From Swiss-Prot:
Organism from which the protein derives: Mycolicibacterium smegmatis (strain ATCC 700084 / mc(2)155) (Mycobacterium smegmatis)
Record function comment: Part of the ESX-3 specialized secretion system, which is required for siderophore-mediated iron acquisition and for the secretion of EsxH and EsxG.
Name used for this protein in its record: ESX-3 secretion system protein EccE3
Compartment list: Cell inner membrane
Pfam family, one: EccE
GO CC annotation: plasma membrane
Keyword set, alphabetical order: Cell inner membrane, Cell membrane, Membrane, Transmembrane, Transmembrane helix, Transport
NCBIfam families per UniProt: T7SS_EccE
Amino acid sequence: MTARIALASLFVVAAVLAQPWQTTTQRWVLGVSIAAVIVLLAWWKGMFLTTRIGRALAMVRRNRAEDTVETDAHRATVVLRVDPAAPAQLPVVVGYLDRYGITCDKVRITHRDAGGTRRSWISLTVDAVDNLAALQARSARIPLQDTTEVVGRRLADHLREQGWTVTVVEGVDTPLPVSGKETWRGVADDAGVVAAYRVKVDDRLDEVLAEIGHLPAEETWTALEFTGSPAEPLLTVCAAVRTSDRPAAKAPLAGLTPARGRHRPALAALNPLSTERLDGTAVPLPAVVRTSVKGSVEHEAAQEAGHPA
């Protein structure tokens, strides 16, 4: 927004300097400046016009491009299948943002609800840049994937000790249709449309997540992604909803924001195996989450000494 205002200000200054607008050149400068300011600051259907045009063009390019799986060689993700998922797992999971000398870029809990059945995964992503010294201390060849898997196995053992069934998996379901066409409101395939949403993180978060599960949908996805440090974690929440019909332009619930024109990358990031962060801005934990997480994280961290990864 600041850059947009600064750019518009440059055109205003150019128009002022072109006074008294008597020559053809001066009038051209005035006209172009007025048009540029209007385009830069025009607001249409919830976003700036230029943003809308940019997203539309990017969407066209993605639809024309061949389906490829983008990978980041500097990041690795390990995924755990958890049965059943429970809020009591949150403190344990958040503690692994920085555990045994390894810092995770993100730790995520993902739920898929379809046909009355829930599947849940915990994903840990390690960034080599953030852990270069720790990785070099383990091996000269920078064992990123091996180290990530070790952290995942430690978390799996930790959860098993507390009574949950945990399995390290390599293949998972994904909310993004394999051969779907992206539209402004979602990604469409023969079975319907999947739309991605950002979820507002506030004291109503638990209520909104419960409401998502009760939507008249064939399939819903929700993901809670923790970043930052165990002491001061940040949270990003996203969701995906599959319906047989085209979704409305307006979000189905208060607290949801559609990923207008960005559904494909948003859904790709929702894949539990993705190394990318969720589409959205990470914010401090709301009180309803912070109360249950913080004390337990401090207790878990006290047990870390003497257990290097």
